[in-house]
């Protein structure tokens, strides 16, 4: 009694309201205080008043009550008890023990047992060293709405640390190594933000048992004997924020096993120690409400992934993997998750034949790790229940892929499976700031893998019901564009999971190509007119272009499926049926290893391809072949060449022949003898060779040497590449040539060159001369040569200037005798009225013409008469599908006669009346014509250079919207201010032309409001 009375002042000042209430609870349970007394004490708002009441009450109750009071005080506030009894906790010896404990922790954090860890679990004997493999993480601070608000580094996190700090992230994001790194930084003494902490404890919550003291003793170091459990407890209270707890994996923590650690997190205000705790996003909901700072671990940067790979793998393996990362966007995306970097490195360590583009292997390893690690957490069900849960997860993923769904609601996840799927890590559960939980696979690609794994198991099942279910999914894939864009990864992982599934898939894809939708791609998704110039596309229908693009991507998809399946020659027959008649594009700068496997194991499939395209670019390389290269595909020695030996190895070492090989040489400034020799080896693999040369200064004087190596060349194109007279002469000596295109050749023609000798190419079917320097004498020579080209089906003469009246001779030579010419373009080529008269007189000799393009030609003298004469003879061209006419100053007066002739060409696809200066009267006549004779197949309409008013265009709009196949139109003019009514109407009409890809309204004075009304998914050109 005397002790309490003597120390009453200190007790009243130091006990604190929390300790007072805890002592009240103890004394009430021991019948020292009754309920009324407890209520009086606890009713005080000022803690000193409460302390004063309890001290006075205890003193009145005698010695026994005083002893019980002191015992309770010792339990709940040991430092105060020690101070009052004269036994100060922090005497010199205990300070020394504290220093010993801190040093022991630092020694632990600097030891190999702490730095070395098993990134894939202790069952897999692969060890990483944290000292050299740790990379700077990307961290995001989140606000109370759970939104990212600020990117942080580890350093800025430690400087702004608040307790408790919650670090969230999905499996494999590197949360554990982050906490270990903090412990190591503290032990090093090199981090100022951590030097404030006297003690730092790293605790794995998955194995936390008993109390906090026992857990630390079990997991970390031996605590000095002089520090008892009560002493340690008091120590934590005394040191307050000088102690940091690093609590790893709250998602694997069982609070009932260690209530004291649970209180350390959720009642941190009592302990006042600093706490950092990591957890998965799904389990964050259990502690988010107590967090003072919430941080998310973001994606790993590509640079960090590269650093980790270099530290983990030996140089040769690291360089190979880094090269594959550079070439594969998908692999780079996967490497944003540290665990995938680890898995990739681990697989690389164990397999010399590992190819990182085999993504199935990565996901399969990850999937198996999740199941292996978390299966023990499944309780309350049989093994069969667990397997059924995994099947259900696969079904969920499959349905999501086909319904384009990657976020799932509660009703999507069966209640009996939800716990299993979340606990195993296959599904992530998001609850933060959501009324109802959302479920996701941690990565879209992982959902596609899970779906592919399930589809594979269905297709190879021995149960007819499951096989039927798998086939029902395949039957949903009927569009090539959907297969390559929406379902490409699903098929990739399905083929990577089993050979039997690959067989079923390839049979289905072969049928899709034969009977399915070859188009199936909306124009809005792939703006083709923006990918290539309109001039290149005007000869091709929209459907043909889409078909070509889709089939090319389909072939790439097929090769990827072959590579992923690792079936080698086992499915040769199924793959051949798929590749039959298709084309393949190869970039010589990036020839992947799997193409060598494709040529090696499926030579019959390569031979089945109708067309193979190979491009070479003007960047010198060093020798690089399949067997002698380093893992990045590049030798460190060998002569510099423009033709990579890797391409030679692929084509020349293959013993069969391509049906058609197209080789493009682009931007090459130099060709040495070795390059030409290499080209000859590549050319020899083709039964039919097409050679395209673009912007290659190197061919001047060497083209003849290149052509001498071409034994089966049937097509040659030269663009913006200088030619000598010898080169031109050699071109005309290749008598098997069927297609010849010369573009942008501005050097003066010399005697004996191309114009003089063109007639030697008697097998020529297609001739294109574009932007070539020709004078009138050259044109006369060219005309003589054209007379001998009896087999020619296509002729383009475009952008030819300074020919004087040379076109008269050319037109006469083309038309004076019956011929099989089907397409003739005479664009911007000095066409005269006399040329037009000659053509009109001889048009009966060109009855097979389907394309007649004479645009960009101004007829000066007697132009109107010549134009009307030609129009009057158009009726003999029964197969006409494209008509682009020249112009003269009064061309519009010819419109009535033209419309009368067009009544006999309902299948017209392209019509061009550029610079005809159409007026309101003519545009109304044209509209009336379209009402009576709808050109349903019209894709291109060029009425540029008109004089139509807003009223005239308004009268035309109703019939204009019926041109449903329209892809391109040009209504450009000069200084035209459209009425608001016209703009609104035009916007409505264009919204109905769903195939439209380009609209040209140059000269229309449109403001932002007008453009907002008119614009759509097509390209709008106004200037």
From Swiss-Prot:
Instruction: List, alphabetically, the GO terms of the cellular component aspect.
Output: cytosol; intracellular membrane-bounded organelle; IPAF inflammasome complex; plasma membrane
Q: List the disulfide bonds.
A: none
Q: Where does ATP bind?
A: 169-176
Query: What Pfam families does the database record attribute to this sequence?
Result: CARD, NACHT, Nlrc4-like_WHD, NLRC4_HD
Q: Where is the CARD domain?
A: 1-88
- Its primary localisation, in coarse terms, equals cytoplasm
Task: Name where the LRR repeats lie.
Answer: 578-598, 655-678, 734-757, 761-784, 786-811, 823-846, 847-869, 877-901, 910-932, 935-962, 964-984, 998-1020
Q: Which residues cross the membrane?
A: none
What are the residue boundaries of the NACHT domain, all occurrences included? Answer: 163-476
The cellular location(s) given in this protein's UniProt record come to: Cytoplasm, Cytosol
Q: Which domain of life is it from?
A: Eukaryota
Q: How is it modified after translation?
A: Phosphorylated at Ser-533 following infection of macrophages with S.typhimurium (Salmonella). Phosphorylation is essential for NLRC4 inflammasome function to promote caspase-1 activation and pyroptosis. PRKCD phosphorylates Ser-533 in vitro.
Keywords, ordered alphabetically = Apoptosis, ATP-binding, Cytoplasm, Immunity, Inflammatory response, Innate immunity, Leucine-rich repeat, Nucleotide-binding, Phosphoprotein, Repeat
Q: Which residues carry this modification: Phosphoserine?
A: 533
Segments for region (Nucleotide-binding domain (NBD)): 95-298
Note down the stretches annotated as region Winged-helix domain (WHD): 356-463
List this protein's GO terms for biological process: activation of innate immune response; apoptotic process; defense response to bacterium; detection of bacterium; inflammatory response; innate immune response; positive regulation of apoptotic process; positive regulation of interleukin-1 beta production
Q: Which InterPro entries match?
A: CARD, DEATH-like_dom_sf, LRR_dom_sf, NACHT_NTPase, NLRC4, Nlrc4-like_WHD, NLRC4_HD, P-loop_NTPase
The keyword Cytoplasm is annotated on this UniProt entry: yes
Q: Can you provide one Gene Ontology molecular function annotated for this UniProt record?
A: caspase binding
Describe, as the record does, how this protein assembles with itself and its partners. Homooligomer; homooligomerizes following activation of Naip proteins by pathogenic proteins such as S.typhimurium (Salmonella) flagellin or PrgJ. Component of the NLRC4 inflammasome, at least composed of NLRC4, caspase-1 (CASP1) and some NAIP family member. Interacts with EIF2AK2/PKR.
The protein's job, in short, is: Key component of inflammasomes that indirectly senses specific proteins from pathogenic bacteria and fungi and responds by assembling an inflammasome complex that promotes caspase-1 activation, cytokine production and macrophage pyroptosis. The NLRC4 inflammasome is activated as part of the innate immune response to a range of intracellular bacteria.
Q: What is this protein called?
A: NLR family CARD domain-containing protein 4
């Amino acid at each position: 009694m005397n002790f309490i009375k003597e120390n009453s002042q200190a007790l009243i000042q130091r006990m604190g309201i929390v300790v007072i209430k805890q002592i009240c609870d103890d004394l009430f349970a021991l019948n020292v205080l009754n309920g009324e007394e407890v209520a009086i004490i606890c009713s005080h708002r000022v803690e000193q008043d409460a302390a004063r009441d309890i001290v006075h009450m205890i003193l009145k109750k005698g010695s026994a009550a005083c002893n019980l009071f002191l015992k309770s005080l010792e339990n709940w506030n040991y430092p105060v008890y020690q101070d009052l009894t004269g036994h100060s906790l922090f005497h010199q010896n205990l300070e020394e023990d504290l220093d010993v404990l801190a040093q022991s922790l630092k020694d632990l954090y600097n030891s190999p047992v702490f730095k070395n860890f098993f990134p894939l679990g202790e069952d897999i004997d692969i060890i990483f060293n944290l000292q050299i493999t740790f990379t700077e993480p990307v961290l995001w601070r989140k606000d109370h709405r759970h939104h990212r608000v600020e990117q942080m580094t580890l350093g800025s996190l430690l400087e702004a640390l608040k307790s408790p700090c919650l670090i969230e992230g999905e499996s494999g994001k590197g949360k554990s190594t982050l906490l270990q790194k903090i412990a190591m930084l503290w032990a090093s003494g090199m981090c100022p933000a951590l030097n404030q902490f006297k003690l730092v404890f790293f605790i794995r919550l998955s194995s936390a048992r008993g109390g906090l003291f026992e857990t630390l003793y079990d997991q970390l170091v031996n605590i000095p004997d002089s520090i008892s459990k009560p002493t340690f407890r008091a120590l934590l209270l005394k040191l307050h924020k000088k102690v940091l707890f690093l609590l790893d994996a709250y998602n694997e923590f069982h609070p009932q096993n260690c209530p004291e650690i649970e209180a350390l997190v959720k009642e941190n205000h009592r302990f006042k120690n600093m706490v950092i705790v990591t957890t998965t996003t799904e389990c964050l909901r259990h502690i988010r409400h107590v967090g003072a700072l919430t941080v998310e671990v973001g994606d790993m940067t590509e640079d960090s992934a590269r650093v980790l790979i270099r530290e983990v793998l030996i140089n040769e393996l690291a360089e190979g993997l880094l090269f594959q990362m550079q070439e594969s966007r998908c692999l780079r995306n996967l490497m944003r998750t540290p665990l995938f970097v680890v898995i990739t490195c681990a697989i690389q360590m164990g397999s010399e034949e590992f190819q990182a583009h085999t993504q199935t292997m990565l996901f399969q390893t990850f999937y198996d790790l999740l199941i292996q690690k978390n299966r023990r957490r499944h309780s309350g069900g049989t093994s069969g229940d667990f397997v059924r849960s995994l099947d259900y997860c696969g079904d969920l993923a499959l349905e999501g892929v086909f319904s384009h769904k990657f976020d799932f609601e509660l009703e999507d996840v069966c209640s009996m499976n939800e716990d299993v799927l979340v606990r195993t890590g296959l599904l992530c559960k998001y609850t933060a700031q959501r009324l109802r939980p959302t479920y996701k696979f941690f990565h879209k690609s992982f959902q596609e893998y899970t779906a592919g794994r399930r589809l594979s198991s269905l297709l190879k099942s021995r149960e007819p019901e499951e096989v039927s279910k798998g086939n029902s999914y395949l039957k949903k894939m009927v569009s090539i564009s959907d297969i390559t864009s929406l379902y490409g990864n699903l098929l990739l992982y399905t083929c990577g999971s089993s050979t039997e599934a690959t067989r079923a898939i390839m049979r289905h894809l072969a049928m899709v190509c034969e009977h399915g939708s070859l188009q199936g791609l909306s124009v809005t998704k792939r703006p083709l007119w923006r990918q290539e110039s309109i001039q290149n596309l005007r000869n091709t229908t929209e459907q043909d272009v889409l078909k070509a693009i889709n089939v090319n991507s389909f072939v790439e998809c097929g090769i990827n499926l072959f590579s992923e399946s690792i079936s080698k020659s086992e499915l040769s027959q199924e793959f051949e049926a798929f590749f039959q008649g298709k084309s393949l594009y190869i970039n010589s700068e990036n020839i992947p290893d799997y193409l060598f496997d494709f040529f090696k194991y499926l030579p019959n499939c390569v031979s089945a391809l109708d067309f193979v395209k190979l491009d070479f670019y003007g960047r010198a390389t060093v020798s690089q072949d399949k067997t002698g290269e380093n893992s990045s595909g590049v030798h460190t020695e060998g002569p510099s060449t423009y033709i990579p030996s890797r391409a030679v190895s692929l084509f020349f070492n293959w013993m069969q022949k391509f049906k058609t090989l197209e080789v493009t040489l682009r931007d090459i400034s130099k060709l040495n003898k070795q390059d030409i020799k290499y080209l000859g080896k590549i050319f020899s693999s083709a039964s039919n060779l097409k050679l395209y040369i673009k912007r290659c200064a190197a061919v001047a004087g060497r083209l003849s040497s290149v052509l001498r190596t071409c034994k089966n060349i049937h097509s040659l194109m030269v663009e913006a590449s200088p030619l000598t007279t010898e080169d031109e002469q050699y071109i005309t000596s290749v008598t098997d040539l069927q297609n010849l295109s010369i573009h942008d050749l501005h050097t003066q023609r010399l005697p004996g060159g191309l114009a003089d000798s063109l007639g030697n190419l008697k097998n020529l079917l297609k001739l294109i001369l574009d932007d070539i320097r020709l004078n009138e004498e050259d044109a006369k020579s060219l005309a003589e040569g054209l007379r001998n080209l009896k087999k020619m089906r296509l002729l383009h003469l475009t952008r030819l200037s300074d020919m004087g009246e040379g076109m008269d001779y050319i037109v006469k030579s083309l038309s004076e005798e019956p011929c099989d010419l089907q397409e003739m373009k005479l664009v911007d080529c000095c066409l005269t009225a006399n040329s037009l008269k000659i053509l009109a007189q001889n048009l009966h000799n060109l009855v097979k013409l389907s394309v007649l393009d004479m645009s960009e030609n101004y007829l000066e003298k007697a132009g109107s008469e010549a134009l009307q004469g030609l129009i009057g003879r158009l009726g003999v061209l029964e197969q006409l599908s494209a008509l682009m006419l020249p112009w003269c100053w009064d061309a519009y007066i010819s419109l009535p006669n033209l419309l009368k002739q067009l009544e006999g060409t309902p299948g017209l696809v392209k019509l061009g009346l550029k610079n005809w200066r159409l007026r309101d009267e003519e545009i109304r006549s044209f509209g009336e014509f379209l009402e009576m004779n709808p050109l349903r197949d019209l894709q291109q309409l060029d009425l540029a250079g008109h004089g139509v008013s807003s009223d005239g265009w308004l009268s035309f709009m109703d019939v204009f919207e019926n041109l449903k196949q329209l892809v391109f139109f040009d209504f450009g003019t000069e200084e035209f201010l459209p009425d608001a009514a016209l703009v609104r109407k035009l916007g409505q009409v264009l919204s109905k032309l769903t195939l439209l890809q380009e609209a040209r309204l140059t000269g229309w004075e449109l403001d932002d409001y007008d453009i907002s009304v008119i614009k759509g998914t097509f390209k709008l050109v106004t200037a």
